[in-house]
A protein has these predicted regions:
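A conserved mid-protein helix/loop that constitutes part of the nucleotide-sugar donor-binding site
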Residues: 19, 23, 194-217, 231-237, ...
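Short alpha-helical donor nucleotide-sugar binding micro-motif in glycosyltransferases
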Residues: 137, 254-255, 262-267
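A short, active-site helix/loop in glycosyltransferases that binds the activated sugar's phosphate group
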Residues: 138-176
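Nucleotide-activated donor-binding/catalytic signature segment of Leloir-type glycosyltransferases, i.e.
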Residues: 235-255
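A short, well-ordered alpha-helix in the C-terminal region of glycosyltransferases
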Residues: 248, 332, 338-353, 359-362, ...
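Acidic donor-binding loop of glycosyltransferase active sites
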Residues: 265-280, 293
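Short hydrophobic beta-strand element within catalytic cores of glycosyltransferases
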Residues: 290, 294-299
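Conserved acidic donor-binding segment of nucleotide-sugar-dependent glycosyltransferases
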Residues: 310-323, 330-337
Length: 370
């Protein structure tokens, strides 16, 4: 069995979808399934390379606009190589991959769509893209969604529910190493404090303003540490100053991957305050679960975030945009930490990378009748 993943980018470029593509490709390869990736690279020329056994066709980008790439070599390369593969596993949203597949000799191929999220922000461009997307949805043999919630509420998928297969994202514990010296340093820096950790790009849909405001309702021995950079940083700093929360909320900026695990390990609870379905899954919750850290997140309509965080098992799910509810949930978890002693077990059974790979291989075998 030979599988070609159509991805937007690929490692060493680091992103959420790219990591999922890598984990599935490498995991399937370890089970004897030949896996390759077609992706846009960040170089001025196209080239091929092997990474951890996965063959990557890296294609030059001619133009980048509204989070999408135009790459003539991507379209040409797919036409050249598609005959070598049994299954085309296309990761969306990615208009370029969709277009390339349309112009390829796809007729005798099995096609799996991996629906990572709807297109939420670029609404005008989406209208132009819709006919091509609908063609692909009709042509696909199966559609993977990362949660039952996303499949249920996505307007784009409503007419194709019979094709949906639910395969949650999984992460690999081997990618997360704790430095005990860093953990000790964090505890010393915030000595006597209950640590609430949060992480993500500082953008509107992440809802960090509500987490900052929640600090007004927290005791003085609580501190919120927010990792990440983004366009909302100045707004958050002004909010912290306005409410005089300098001793309760710290914006840490970018945290290196080598240090991230240590921040999770040092925290008492993790908070994902996202408010829009642009946050389709919330992989960062899995990272907290891995370290047996319970999570407070929001029940976002049409998003899988609240489904991933099982209420009263792995954490507490609250309504979005309510700072007081966030604060109340954070206090409840910290005051009854023993209730969430099995968070890591919940992770291992549901969100370990091996679970994702096994379910994906099962689907591959189903659609080619092995």
């Amino acid at each position: 069995m030979k599988v070609l993943h159509l991805s937007k980018y690929y490692k060493p470029y680091s992103g959420g979808i790219e990591q999922v593509v890598a984990d599935i490709s490498e995991g399937c390869l370890s089970k004897g399934i030949d896996s390759s990736v077609l992706a846009v690279n960040h170089k001025t020329n196209s080239y091929e390379y092997d990474l951890n056994g996965v063959h990557v066709y890296g294609c030059k980008s001619n133009y980048h606009y509204a989070s999408a790439d135009v790459s003539i070599s991507y379209i040409i390369k797919l036409r050249q190589i598609i005959e070598s593969f049994d299954i085309i596993h296309i990761h969306l949203p990615n208009p370029l991959a969709n277009l390339a597949l349309f112009f390829s000799n796809y007729k005798n191929k099995k096609i799996i769509i991996h629906w990572h999220s709807d297109i939420v922000k670029q609404k005008k461009l989406k209208m132009l893209y819709m006919p091509l997307q609908q063609w692909l949805l009709k042509r696909a043999d199966a559609i993977i969604t990362t949660s039952p919630v996303y499949g249920e509420f996505s307007d784009d998928l409503r007419k194709h529910k019979n094709k949906i297969k639910i395969i949650p994202i999984g992460i690999n514990p081997e990618n997360y190493k704790v430095d005990t010296n860093i953990v000790k340093k964090i505890h010393e820096q915030y000595k006597g404090k209950k640590i609430i950790f949060s992480l993500g790009r500082l953008v509107y849909y992440k809802g960090f303003e509500y987490l900052v405001e929640s600090a007004k309702f927290l005791p003085d021995d609580y501190i919120i540490l927010i990792g990440g950079n983004g366009e909302e940083k100045q707004k958050l700093l002004e909010l912290i100053q306005r409410y005089k929360l300098e001793d309760k909320v710290k914006l840490l900026g970018f945290i290196r991957h080598e240090e991230l695990s240590s921040y999770f390990a040092a925290s008492n609870v993790f908070c994902l305050p996202s408010i829009e379905k642009s946050e389709a899954f919330g992989v960062v919750q899995l990272e907290a679960f891995l370290f047996n850290i319970p999570v407070v997140s929001c029940d976002i309509k049409g998003s899988g975030v609240g489904w991933v965080n099982k209420n009263n098992v792995s954490g507490i799910v609250v309504q979005p945009k309510f700072p007081y509810e966030l604060a109340d949930a954070l206090k409840k978890i910290i005051s009854d930490r023993d209730k969430y002693a099995d968070v890591k077990k919940y992770f291992t059974e549901n969100f370990h990378v091996n679970v994702m790979v096994e379910r994906t291989i099962k689907l591959y075998k189903e659609i080619i009748n092995i």
